[in-house]
């Protein structure tokens, strides 16, 4: 029996994608091979690779000025790879810290340069806001400005992206990429691990403006130097072939759903239903400012936290899994990525109401 999976990542995948992957497991398109067995330079895998790149470019409307790269190491590795590729002759990069992940990025950058905290969204209740551009205190000549536009742990999503002129804007989009249209031209670099909205764990997507490919530090490993990866069409080393294949199936699924405009409408509906339920109750609490509440990751707390384990056990009994909040913040978290259907959110909301009534 399939359950409703609210995991923050690895996360739910579309059932259509899983079934197609199962059907093609032993024999991909009459090749007699599984994708897992293919040479990454053979014509069979190259067709998968090129289709995935083309479909992602179409979905996000990536301009010709930007290259799409498939790497490894996830978003955490990019916290090191970004400064190694962008600091160049500069020492300083600016960070707007809105949650746990941008804080990790800031801390990692200290190994390669001098990160500057331009703004923070931390309050007495934790990370609950996204500082407006007027609050940012940028340094004189930063190599780039870093944002995490959706904080998976804290549930803060930044929707308003300012124009920084000549300063490259770098965004960790791991947990909201492909959930809504984006103006990719505003960014110097976008990066995201796949295991939330792109596909399965193993591949990392980096979208980088071509004029930024010549800034790498000499210490940057060749396999992580964007210029080298781009020159080799993401095949400098053996890529995570099966993860790219799954990502390609997800891209095709998204196109069949009507693209990102249609997906965004669904995601707004799902998030509104869940937040409305939280706000209308006297039992559940979300502390994030409404204007920057994440559509993908919804943290909430029970008024009586001694009942947390009862809540999770009851949810599991109804087939509602992976609702425990991150250990750093506690409480609950429902990650409602693209592949989580509206029916799953409705089932969660029904359970939340029942649980609240039983405890009243």
UniProtKB/Swiss-Prot annotation:
PROSITE patterns on file: AA_TRANSFER_CLASS_5 (PS00595)
Cellular location(s): Cytoplasm
Cofactor mode of binding and number, as noted: Binds 1 pyridoxal phosphate per subunit.
Group of enzyme by EC: transferase
EC number(s) given by UniProt: 2.6.1.52
Molecular-function GO term, any one: O-phospho-L-serine:2-oxoglutarate aminotransferase activity
Modified residues (N6-(pyridoxal phosphate)lysine): 196
Main location: cytoplasm
Binding-site list for L-glutamate: 41
CDD domains: PSAT_like (cd00611)
SUPFAM superfamilies linked: PLP-dependent transferases
PANTHER family: PHOSPHOSERINE AMINOTRANSFERASE
Species this protein is from: Burkholderia ambifaria (strain ATCC BAA-244 / DSM 16087 / CCUG 44356 / LMG 19182 / AMMD) (Burkholderia cepacia (strain AMMD))
Cofactor: pyridoxal 5'-phosphate
InterPro entries attached to this UniProt entry: Aminotrans_V_dom (IPR000192), Aminotrans_V_PyrdxlP_BS (IPR020578), Pser_aminoTfrase (IPR022278), PyrdxlP-dep_Trfase (IPR015424), PyrdxlP-dep_Trfase_major (IPR015421), PyrdxlP-dep_Trfase_small (IPR015422)
Domain of life: Bacteria
Pathway note: Amino-acid biosynthesis; L-serine biosynthesis; L-serine from 3-phospho-D-glycerate: step 2/3; Cofactor biosynthesis; pyridoxine 5'-phosphate biosynthesis; pyridoxine 5'-phosphate from D-erythrose 4-phosphate: step 3/5
Subunit description: Homodimer.
Record protein name field: Phosphoserine aminotransferase
């Amino acid at each position: 029996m399939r359950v409703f999976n609210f995991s923050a990542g690895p996360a739910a995948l579309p059932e259509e994608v899983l079934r197609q992957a199962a059907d093609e497991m032993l024999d991909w398109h009459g090749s007699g091979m599984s994708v897992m067995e293919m040479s990454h330079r053979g014509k069979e895998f190259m067709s998968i690779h090129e289709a995935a790149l083309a479909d992602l470019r179409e979905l996000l409307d990536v301009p010709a000025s930007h290259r799409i790269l498939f790497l490894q190491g996830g978003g955490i590795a990019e916290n090191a790879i970004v400064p190694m590729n962008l600091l160049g002759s500069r020492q300083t990069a600016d960070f707007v810290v809105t949650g746990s992940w941008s804080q990790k990025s800031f801390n990692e950058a200290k190994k390669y340069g001098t990160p500057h905290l331009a703004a923070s969204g931390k309050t007495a209740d934790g990370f609950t806001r996204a500082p407006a551009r007027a609050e940012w205190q940028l340094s004189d000549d930063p190599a780039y400005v870093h944002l995490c536009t959706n904080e998976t742990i804290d549930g803060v999503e930044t929707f308003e992206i300012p124009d920084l002129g000549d300063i490259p804007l770098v965004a960790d989009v791991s947990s909201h990429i492909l959930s809504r249209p984006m103006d990719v031209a505003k960014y110097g670099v976008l990066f995201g691990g796949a295991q939330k909205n792109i596909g399965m764990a193993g591949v990392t997507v980096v979208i980088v403006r071509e004029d930024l490919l010549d800034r790498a530090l000499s210490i940057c490993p060749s396999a992580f130097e964007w210029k080298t990866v781009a020159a080799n069409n993401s095949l400098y080393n053996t890529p995570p072939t099966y993860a790219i294949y799954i990502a390609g199936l997800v891209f095709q699924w998204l196109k069949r759903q009507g693209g990102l405009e249609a997906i965004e409408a669904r995601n707004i509906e799902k998030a509104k239903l869940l937040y409305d339920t939280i706000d209308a109750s006297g039992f559940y609490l979300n502390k994030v400012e409404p204007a920057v509440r994440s559509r993908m990751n919804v943290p909430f707390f029970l008024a009586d936290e001694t009942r947390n384990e009862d809540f999770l056990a009851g949810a599991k009994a109804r087939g509602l899994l992976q609702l425990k909040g991150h250990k750093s913040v506690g409480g609950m978290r429902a990650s409602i990525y693209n592949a989580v259907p509206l029916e799953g959110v409705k089932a969660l909301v029904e359970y939340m109401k029942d649980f609240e009534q039983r405890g009243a």
